UniProtKB/Swiss-Prot annotation:
GO terms for molecular function: GTP binding; GTP cyclohydrolase I activity; zinc ion binding. It comes from Helicobacter pylori (strain J99 / ATCC 700824). This is GTP cyclohydrolase 1. Belongs to the GTP cyclohydrolase I family. The keyword Zinc applies. It holds the Pfam family GTP_cyclohydroI. Pathway: Cofactor biosynthesis; 7,8-dihydroneopterin triphosphate biosynthesis; 7,8-dihydroneopterin triphosphate from GTP: step 1/1. It comes from the Bacteria.
């Protein structure tokens, strides 16, 4: 890691021995371990260990779960909120497990579209609900800091499975709950 940063500092014209930079390689290495710890965790385990047989057959919504991730194209952050709705069949998941699922997938190099899809597909596979919907809203620093430089742009993605995809009324109910 130190060799990488020494080359990086040289390439941008910076003095690697400058006081403020001496510990930077170590600090960044620790930061990267934290930012990308999602590679060392299995998202399926997070859900499998946190569900129980339930009697609820109405919609359950976990709204505005904050996340941050790193764009795999530019290695810059993107961040925002994810909302997950589902209609149980037999399994109800602990609410913190939804946040954990989001955290595991977001702590990897990502694109927003794949992040949204991975959350929905894993939830659908493990919990087997009658339907699941995932909506992700994010700001991308790669869009704000370079290229088109649009600081206020918000990107929205959604993935729908089961009843949310088949039934417009179910989808509308979820969207109404997000507004309230």
């Amino acid at each position: 890691m130190e060799k990488f940063f020494n080359q990086f500092f040289e390439n941008i014209g910076e003095d690697k021995n400058r006081e403020g930079l001496k510990e930077t390689p170590k600090r960044v290495q620790e930061l990267w371990k934290f930012l990308y710890k999602g590679y060392k965790e299995d998202p399926r385990v997070a859900l499998k260990s946190a569900y129980f047989q339930g009697v609820c057959d109405e919609m359950i919504v976990a709204q505005n779960i904050e996340f941050y991730s790193t764009c795999e194209h530019h290695l810059l952050p993107f961040f925002g909120n994810i909302s997950v709705g589902y209609i149980p069949k037999e399994k109800i998941v602990g609410i913190s497990a939804i946040a954990k699922l989001i955290e595991i997938y977001s702590k990897r190099l990502q694109i927003q579209e794949r992040l949204t899809t991975q959350i929905a597909e894993t939830f659908d596979e493990i919990i087997e609900p009658r339907g699941v919907i995932v909506v992700c809203e994010a700001k991308h620093l790669c869009m704000s800091m370079q290229g088109v430089q649009k600081q206020n742009a918000i990107i929205k993605t959604s993935v729908l499975r089961g009843l949310f995809k088949k039934d417009p009324k179910t989808r509308a109910e979820f969207m109404q709950l997000l507004k309230s």
